[in-house]
Each structure stands twice: as structure tokens, then as C-alpha cells.
UniProtKB/Swiss-Prot annotation:
Changing residue 328 to A: Reduction in RNA-binding, reduced RNA-dependent ATPase and unwinding activities. The B30.2/SPRY domain-binding motif mediates recognition by proteins containing a B30.2/SPRY domain. Residues 1-186 are annotated as: Disordered. The modification Phosphoserine is found at residue 22. This is ATP-dependent RNA helicase vasa. Interacts with eIF5B and faf. Interacts with gus (via B30.2/SPRY domain) and Fsn (via B30.2/SPRY domain). Interacts with aub, me31B, eIF-4a and TER94. Interacts with piwi; this interaction is RNA independent. Interacts with Dcr-1 and Fmr1; these interactions occur in the polar granules. The lineage of its organism: Eukaryota, Metazoa, Ecdysozoa, Arthropoda, Hexapoda. Changing residue 188 to A: Strongly decreases interaction with gus. Residues 184-203 are annotated as: Required for posterior localization in oocyte. Its cofactor is Mg(2+). Residues 1-10 have a biased composition (Acidic residues). It comes from Drosophila melanogaster. A motif (DEAD box) lies at residues 399-402.
Length: 661
């Protein structure tokens, strides 16, 4: 199962994944596992000991209820909560707030999520059937354990105080699809009454309007920012506007310039120099630049300025700008940047993304907003319900377009761009770190007479990141990680391969007195946002993340990136280490290379290190010898394919490439 950080159209946030736990082989397991010893299927009731008796997490039988606290992973350290830092008597790792840890129920023990472990559970669109087994009397049973046998009363209607908020009854572990499955039928083939479900959604905290907080979140230019002047730039298209050299020469509104200055921006980056005049002139744009190069400001500044310069009447449910992002975290980041640049103007900025209350977001949107930032699934949900239409849309921005293609959003992108309500006279802007041929051909359906801008990659910016590669097998990784973090742990992101591995490593580090949190696709949206807040404000020194967090995380003061597990694609390596050393600042990246597992990217890794002036270890050269890899040493993430004879799409005459130094 992949890390699905994409957006679900309708989400029951507290019940997400309803018992669907996967290991490296993509096999699904009940959260409570197979009951052994005293585990009793994770003590399904009062504490909901997560994975109580499952041997495959810590290599031993969990201790049932997790000390009565509902601790994550059941018997982890005498019932201590998630990450080991909170111990006996607490209801969850954040303490008593509900969540999906102890007492609340949902998809975790007790209320119906896993239904005692060996009983079937009602996840997803009807859930898995659960494990059949025989009791001591030899009776075959499925998901109908007596209360005494399953370690606590399930109680379909817990009081709010007991479960941390109003929840759905039995089977709320899935995505709340109202259809019958095997768990609706008892052993006598009688239909089990399907009681009414209640659903609880996460409502994000209101964004701050404090100027200091709004303008202090960005990353200031570093001492190596001047290197950006040496990055090569290629521009393709007809009648291309000339680049700007200063924000003051970009014909932006005064209030936008004031907010740019408050943000600490002094000189535009190469992508901003080229993109701002193109967008201001009314042209479509396909822009290719690496993460951390200022892409977000490159499209927000001219768009917001244009809205102020040429105001149109604001109609409810008809945004004038639609910005689509592949991940929730990136959408939130763009939302915060838009609020910053539109500060003290009359422009209204809205956001819609999955894992949060649809009703709450709809209330915000129906107040009217000029700009909507959205993830694809949730945006289409609003569109399908006619809460959002595109009659007044003047700008459409597809950010991280290559990532959207990788995540399977190509059809969603087509549905948005070709929607019957889409205003014909709109500008389409596509931004990405890479533009492979496939996505350029699809873009040809949407863009007209567009300008293609490619900003040089790797060399200049990555040379600001000191890259170190260690040869470490999988059994030595934890001790090596402790050794590195003992020197300096603050502001460290550790990338791992699996969601389960992220939680396990976060728990391990917390027990070693390194305040650690994790972020991945199986965590509830409230927990994902809380994890980022804790890491940003320094209360958590270390953030464990899966590879999908390698894009979109623009966090101040990230000092160190550690590849605990190497990615399978070299592009992901570049994106990961790009979390540090941003906007001309120094950074540090450390990678654990396991020759048995990571040999396939060795040749590409050697090219990356050589291209950025880094030391290449002998063991890595040996592993990469004879392999050519798939990585190209070209300095650009994409080449305009319109000049090729077999291209079908925009028929614009393409001038010879310009190179702007």
C-alpha cells in the first residue's frame, strides 16, 4: 500500500483506515493482530490497546491493554503511550484528548474499529472479513465476541467525556460507507441492526492575523543567495517578456511590494524573475524549478497584484483563482503564503482539503473568497456538489504537477480543467520541479501559447548542502542514528520507507530521550498538523517522515536531513535533501546506504555527489561501477517538447531557446 497523502472526497477523519495495517509486503492485518497470551486481541474495550498481542511490531507479545491507558501498540513499555514518553494512566500520547488512542474507540479497539482483534472489523467500503477462529467450545465465531471475552465492553454509545468527542458506533473504523458487509450478519444468518452512525471531523484552528506571526514564518535568504545569479535559465516560446531584476520593476501593486519587503525578500530568485512578467502579461506558463527556489511567490505575487489592479465583483462560490496542490501540507503552506502577500488587502483567501470537516470548510468558502487553494479530491467534491463553480475563474495554478501525475491525479486534473463551468478566458500556470514528456503532453491540452521556463537544478543549490553517505546495513541503522543525533538533534528530519517504520522509529527515539514526532499518510489530519506545529516550534526536535513529505515541507531552521532508508528513485533523494539548504542557506544531509538494498541508485548517487562538488566514498564508487543509472547530468528538470516532430498539442511556433545568465 502506498503512502496515500492524496485527498479523499469524503473523509471520516477519526475512523480512517478502519484496521487496515500494512507491512512491507502490502498485506492487511487487523489492528489488534492475532491474540496471544494475555493480549486478548489488544483489549478491545476500555483502553483499546493498539495491537496488543501482535508479535510483529516489537518481537514480543504486547501486554494487553497497555497498562489500562489505551497506549499505542498496547504493551509498549508497560502501557506507555505512543513514543514511549507518556506512561501509565494516560489515555493517549497527547493525553486525554481523544485522538485514535485509547478510550475513544473508532478504528482502534473498544468501540467497534477492530472489534476485539479476532472478530471481523468494518473498515473501508465494507471491511475485511476478520479472522475465523474456534473458541474453547469449538464454536466457530466471526466478530461477535462476548464483552467478557474481548477485554472490555464495546459500548456503541459512549458518553462524549469517555471517548474524547462524539463518535460513530460500531464499525466507525472505516470510511463510513453505509453498506452491509460480513460483520452485519451473525452466526445464525440474522441481520445485525446497523445503528445510526455519527461522524466527527477535524476543524483546524483559525489562522492567526498577527503580523509578526504571519511574516516570521518564512525562510530568510542565506549567505549563499548570490549563487542563484549563476544558475542557468532557459526560456522557450514566442514574444517572451523580458525578466525583471527587482521587485520594484515588476509592476506590482504597492501593498504587494510592502508585504514582499515585510517578508524579507530583497532580490527575486531566477524563477521569480522570469515568471512574474510572463504571468503579468497574461500568458500561460509552464515553469520548471527545483523546490526551495521561490516558485510559490513566483505565481502568487503577480496573481494577487492582478486581482487588486483589475477587481471583479466577488460572487459566492465562484473563486477567481484556483490553486491545486497534490498534498494537504503543501496546500496549507500555499494558503499561508497567500495570506501573507495579501495581508491588509481586501482579498479573501480560502482553502479546502481532505481530513477536515466539509461543513466547516463550506461555511468558510460560502462567505466568498477570491482565491481557493485545494487538493484535487476535495476540490472536486465541492464542485460535484455545486458549492464551487468556475464561471469567474481567471487563474488556474497546478503546483507540483509532476507529483500530481505520480499520485494518479491526472484524471482529476482533466476534470477540473475541462469542467463545464470553467471560464474560457483564463490563464493556466503549471509549476513543478521536473516536467517529463508525459506531463508536458497532457499540459498541451490545457495551455495555450504558453511560455516554457526551465531553471537550472542541482549544482548551485545543492552545493549549499553538505552531503555525507555512510555504509550502514539495516541492523546497524538505529545505533548509527543515535550516534548522529547525540551530536545535534535539533531541527532534524529523518526519512524512512514505511509508515509503520516511521511510528516505530519515533517511539524508539522518544524512549532514548530525543523528543520526536512523526508524519505520514495514516495519521489523522489533526495529528499531521499538530506534528508539524510541534516540530516548527521546537517542542519536538526530530520529525520522522515518509518520502511523500519530501516535497512541500518548507520549514524554517531545518538543520539536518537524514535518509534512514534510501529512496528507490534518485529524484526523491534530491527532493529530500532539498528540505535543508534552502534559499542560499547552509544545510546538512546524511544518508545510510545499505549495499544489499540500495545498489540500484548507486551510480545515480555518484553523479549527484560529483555534480555538486561533494566527496564520493570509495564503497559507493564500487557499488556504482559499471552502472549508468537513469539520472541525467543535464542542469534542467525538463526540456520543452514542442519542438519535436511527434508532439501533438499546442501548435504555437516555438522560437529557439534563449539562455538567460
Amino acid at each position: 500500500m502506498s503512502d496515500d497523502w492524496d485527498d479523499e472526497p469524503i473523509v471520516d477523519t477519526r475512523g480512517a483506515r478502519g484496521g487496515d495495517w500494512s507491512d512491507d509486503e502490502d498485506t492487511a492485518k487487523s489492528f489488534s493482530g492475532e491474540a496471544e497470551g494475555d493480549g486478548v486481541g489488544g483489549s478491545g474495550g476500555e483502553g483499546g490497546g493498539y495491537q496488543g498481542g501482535n508479535r510483529d511490531v516489537f518481537g514480543r507479545i504486547g501486554g494487553g491493554r497497555g497498562g489500562g491507558a489505551g497506549g499505542y501498540r498496547g504493551g509498549n513499555r508497560d502501557g506507555g503511550g505512543f513514543h514511549g514518553g507518556r506512561r501509565e494512566g494516560e489515555r493517549d500520547f497527547r493525553g486525554g484528548e481523544g485522538g485514535f488512542r485509547g478510550g475513544q474507540g473508532g478504528s482502534r479497539g473498544g468501540q467497534g474499529g477492530s472489534r476485539g482483534g479476532q472478530g471481523g472489523f468494518r473498515g473501508g467500503e465494507g471491511g475485511f472479513r476478520g479472522r475465523l477462529y474456534e473458541n474453547e467450545d469449538g464454536d466457530e465465531r466471526r466478530g461477535r465476541l462476548d464483552r467478557e471475552e474481548r477485554g472490555g465492553e464495546r459500548r456503541g454509545r459512549l458518553d462524549r467525556e469517555e471517548r474524547g468527542g462524539e463518535r460513530g458506533e460500531r464499525g466507525d473504523g472505516g470510511f463510513a460507507r453505509r453498506r452491509r458487509n460480513e460483520d452485519d450478519i451473525n452466526n445464525n444468518n440474522n441481520i445485525v441492526e446497523d445503528v445510526e452512525r455519527k461522524r466527527e471531523f477535524y476543524i483546524p484552528p483559525e489562522p492567526s492575523n498577527d503580523a509578526i506571526e504571519i511574516f516570521s514564518s518564512g525562510i530568510a535568504s542565506g549567505i549563499h543567495f548570490s549563487k542563484y545569479n549563476n544558475i542557468p535559465v532557459k526560456v522557450t516560446g514566442s514574444d517572451v517578456p523580458q525578466p525583471i531584476q527587482h521587485f520594484t520593476s515588476a509592476d506590482l501593486r504597492d501593498i504587494i511590494i510592502d508585504n514582499v519587503n515585510k517578508s524579507g525578500y530583497k532580490i527575486p530568485t531566477p524563477i521569480q524573475k522570469c515568471s512574474i512578467p510572463v504571468i503579468s502579461s497574461g500568458r500561460d506558463l509552464m515553469a520548471c524549478a527545483q523546490t526551495g527556489s521561490g516558485k510559490t511567490a513566483a505565481f502568487l505575487l503577480p496573481i494577487l497584484s492582478k486581482l487588486l489592479e483589475d477587481p471583479h465583483e466577488l460572487e459566492l462560490g465562484r473563486p477567481q483563482v484556483v490553486i491545486v496542490s497534490p498534498t494537504r501540507e503543501l496546500a496549507i503552506q500555499i494558503f499561508n503564503e497567500a495570506r501573507k502577500f495579501a495581508f491588509e488587502s481586501y482579498l479573501k483567501i480560502g482553502i479546502v482539503y481532505g481530513g477536515t470537516s466539509f461543513r466547516h470548510q463550506n461555511e468558510c468558502i460560502t462567505r466568498g473568497c477570491h482565491v481557493v487553494i485545494a487538493t484535487p479530491g476535495r476540490l472536486l467534491d465541492f464542485v460535484d456538489r455545486t458549492f464551487i463553480t468556475f464561471e469567474d475563474t481567471r487563474f488556474v495554478v497546478l503546483d507540483e504537477a509532476d507529483r500530481m501525475l505520480d499520485m494518479g491525479f491526472s484524471e482529476d486534473m482533466r476534470r477540473i480543467m475541462t469542467h463545464v463551468t470553467m471560464r474560457p478566458e483564463h490563464q493556466t500556470l503549471m509549476f513543478s520541479a521536473t516536467f517529463p514528456e508525459e506531463i508536458q503532453r497532457m499540459a498541451g491540452e490545457f495551455l495555450k501559447n504558453y511560455v516554457f521556463v526551465a531553471i537550472g537544478i542541482v549544482g548551485g543549490a545543492c552545493s549549499d548542502v553538505k552531503q555525507t553517505i555512510y555504509e550502514v546495513n539495516k541492523y546497524a541503522k538505529r545505533s548509527k542514528l543515535i550516534e548522529i543525533l547525540s551530536e545535534q538533534a535539533d531541527g532534524t528530519i529523518v526519512f524512512v520507507e514505511t509508515k509503520r517504520g516511521a511510528d516505530f522509529l519515533a517511539s524508539f527515539l522518544s524512549e532514548k530521550e530525543f523528543p520526536t514526532t512523526s508524519i505520514h499518510g495514516d495519521r489523522l489530519q489533526s495529528q499531521r498538523e499538530q506534528a508539524l506545529r510541534d516540530f516548527k516550534n521546537g517542542s519536538m526536535k526530530v520529525l520522522i517522515a515518509t518520502s511523500v513529505a519530501s516535497r512541500g515541507l518548507d520549514i524554517k531552521n531545518i538543520k539536518h536531513v537524514i535518509n534512514y532508508d534510501m529512496p528507490s528513485k534518485i529524484d526523491d533523494y534530491v527532493h529530500r535533501i532539498g528540505r535543508t539548504g534552502r534559499v542560499g542557506n547552509n544545510g546538512r544531509a546524511t544518508s545510510f546506504f545499505d549495499p544489499e538494498k540500495d545498489r540500484a541508485i548507486a551510480a545515480d548517487l555518484v553523479k549527484i555527489l560529483e555534480g555538486s562538488g561533494q566527496t564520493v566514498p570509495d564503497f559507493l564508487r564500487t557499488c556504482g561501477a559499471g552502472g549508468d543509472g537513469g539520472y541525467s547530468n543535464q542542469n534542467f528538470g525538463g526540456v520543452d517538447v514542442r519542438g519535436r516532430g511527434n508532439y501533438v498539442g499546442d501548435a504555437t511556433n516555438v522560437e529557439e531557446e534563449e539562455q538567460w545568465d
